[in-house]
């Protein structure tokens, strides 16, 4: 497959680590180079095959939202071109898929906002009538819009482990009451503004995950990726129906295939190694990512 980068290899900068999708390098003491690869992770397991262009799509989408939402909260962007911090023979690895960002102290809580009942939120609700300890009205259906968006944080897990939904009280205990409340308020504001914009483009943002860090002055700063097809559930508004799982512009396609696949007659146990993705699943997933970018931002892949 062409246009695919499974793992970067930037030897001119110190490697800090490979995440599920991103490779991080140090740029001096106060900045990072983040390279978004074409790796795909589903159920917290990294697939063995890259999805062509996925990293560039995610990078362009995140940059679009960072600019659009900058009036709500500071973000990690520096405006430095990634091509200027690597060696000449490494430029192709970063072109269109990397950013140079401020080095922040990460807050180890995923700030999840849900406007609709879906995924693990729907499962929690079916079992308990609540999501992350938040009581919801009885009788809601799968994919139903919630009366108001809710903040349902998760504890950031180690690589390969599943993030765990936690209550707001637990977030307060972990990071302090004032910071927890600020994070909740900003996350809901970001979600509402993004959802309002996406609606004008015929897309429903069912839920999304934000990540924050603190800068040297202790200022809450938006980081990592924002409102991409990896960190959000995007549904086309024209085929949305309550009570069904709407087809989404993200890796749901891969998740559904993984749920259905049988290995030696048994379901895949959602642990590494992942089953080999068929070419048609890879191609359809790549097309979904590109379509999400165009539909949402009006931009073609640069």
Swiss-Prot record:
Pathway: Purine metabolism; IMP biosynthesis via de novo pathway; 5-amino-1-(5-phospho-D-ribosyl)imidazole-4-carboxamide from 5-amino-1-(5-phospho-D-ribosyl)imidazole-4-carboxylate: step 1/2
Catalytic EC class: ligase
GO molecular function: ATP binding; phosphoribosylaminoimidazolesuccinocarboxamide synthase activity
Catalysed reaction, written as an equation: 5-amino-1-(5-phospho-D-ribosyl)imidazole-4-carboxylate + L-aspartate + ATP = (2S)-2-[5-amino-1-(5-phospho-beta-D-ribosyl)imidazole-4-carboxamido]succinate + ADP + phosphate + 2 H(+)
Record-linked InterPro entries: SAICAR_synt/ADE2_N, SAICAR_synth, SAICAR_synthetase_CS
Keyword annotations of the record: ATP-binding, Ligase, Nucleotide-binding, Purine biosynthesis
GO biological process: 'de novo' IMP biosynthetic process
Enzyme Commission numbers on file: 6.3.2.6
Source organism superkingdom: Bacteria
GO cellular component: cytoplasm
Homology family: Belongs to the SAICAR synthetase family.
Classification via PANTHER family: PHOSPHORIBOSYLAMINOIMIDAZOLE-SUCCINOCARBOXAMIDE SYNTHASE (PTHR43700:SF1)
Listed name of the protein: Phosphoribosylaminoimidazole-succinocarboxamide synthase
Species of origin: Cupriavidus taiwanensis (strain DSM 17343 / BCRC 17206 / CCUG 44338 / CIP 107171 / LMG 19424 / R1)
């Amino acid at each position: 497959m062409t246009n695919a980068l499974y793992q970067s290899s930037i030897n001119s900068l110190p490697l800090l680590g490979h995440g599920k999708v991103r490779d991080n390098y140090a740029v001096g003491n106060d900045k990072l180079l983040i390279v978004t690869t074409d790796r795909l992770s589903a159920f917290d397991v990294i697939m063995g095959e890259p999805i062509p262009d996925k990293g560039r799509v995610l990078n362009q989408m995140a940059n679009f939202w960072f600019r659009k939402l900058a009036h709500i909260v500071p973000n990690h962007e520096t405006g430095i071109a990634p091509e200027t911090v690597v060696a000449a023979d490494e430029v192709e690895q970063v072109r269109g898929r990397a950013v140079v960002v401020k080095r922040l102290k990460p807050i180890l809580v995923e700030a999840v906002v849900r406007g609709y009942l879906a995924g693990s939120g729907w499962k929690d609700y079916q079992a308990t009538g609540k999501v992350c300890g938040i009581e919801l009205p009885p009788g809601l259906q799968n994919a139903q819009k919630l009366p108001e968006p809710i903040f349902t944080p998760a504890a950031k897990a180690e690589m390969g482990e599943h993030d765990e939904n936690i209550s707001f009280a637990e977030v307060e205990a972990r990071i302090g009451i004032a910071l927890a409340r600020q994070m909740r308020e900003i996350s809901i504001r970001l979600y509402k503004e993004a959802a309002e914009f996406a609606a004008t483009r015929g897309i429903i943002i069912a839920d999304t995950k934000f990540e924050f860090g603190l800068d040297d002055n202790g200022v809450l700063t938006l980081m990592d990726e924002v409102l991409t097809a990896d960190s959000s559930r995007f549904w086309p508004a024209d085929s949305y129906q309550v009570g069904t799982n709407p087809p989404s512009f993200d890796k749901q396609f891969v998740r559904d295939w993984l749920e259905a696949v049988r290995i030696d007659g048994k379901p895949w146990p959602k642990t590494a190694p992942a089953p080999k993705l068929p070419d048609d699943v890879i191609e359809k997933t790549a097309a979904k990512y590109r379509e999400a970018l165009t539909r949402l931002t009006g931009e073609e892949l640069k």
